[in-house]
Structure formats: structure tokens, C-alpha cells
């Protein structure tokens, strides 16, 4: 029987690849023989990670902006020129801001709406836009996998991170929509899942 978990030579794109989760996942996947594409906005850290990953497998770093579709399209072009395809997308870009968090001495009424909006943009639209740009390659191939990063804070208000938790809850819903849409309209071998890292 074929090894269902063999990822050797699979082209895996990781947004937010220089973050704690992205970097550790990238290292593990490279050790398994996957070809890793790191997309991140921090060039120095990206170049260092690219060199580290290239000692284990084949890797490419590209500067990106997950909120800019034109930049993502340029990233896709570079990935296809280098590797010819995209097998997996890991949407690991995300983060939080103090203004979108309820301070211990404040209430939800004190939230900074601009900060809240930025956190939703980064986490939700930073997942939606890369998915929209990269999924067409998988749709043409009739197979592939997208993994979105959700959070325990999306499931219950464990801490005061209301902006982050709200965005991650939306990602969970978006994941369900995309899973249904892609499987029914393109291929059942095109999967979309979300993981909920613990802390």
C-alpha cells in the first residue's frame, strides 16, 4: 500500500513562514523531503530560513504581502517558474495588536476599532487572498491541500484577544465554505482544513 503521508517533492507554500509556527513546520516538512516556499514580509529572516531549509531539501524565499493580490500573483509566477506547480498551501500568516485586545482594566467598549480592523484584515484576508491566488493551480491539477490556521480563541473566549479570536472564528467558517466549494466544483481531491494550535 502506498504511504498516504509521503510528501517527498511536494511543493508546499507557507505564508507567514518566518513566524514561530511557520518556521517549525517548514523545518519538519523539509526534513521529510518536501520543497518549501517561504512567503514572508521580513527579508532578512526569510533569507536565513531559506538557507537553513536548503540544507535539508529545496527551498525558496519570496518577500510577500498577504494583503496585496498583485504581490501574491508575482509570488505565484516565481513559484511556478521554479517548481512548476503548487501542491499545498499553509496559511500561517497572522498576528495580533494590543489595541484589538481587552486590557485587564478595560472593557470591550474600549477597543481600538482601527486596530481591530487591522487584526481582522491580517488574519482573515491574509488567509482569503493567498487562497484565491494559489488555489487555481490546484484546481487545474484537480488535487491539492490548503491548511488554514485557526485558534482556540475562535472557539471560546479564553483570553482577551477579541479581535484575533473574531478573525480566527471567521477563518473557521471560511474553511468550511472553501472545503465544500472546491470539493464539489473542482475535485474531491482538493481539500481544505483548519488546524487549531494549542498553547
Predicted regions located by residue number:
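Residue(s) in the substrate-gating loop at a strand-loop-helix junction
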Residues: 151
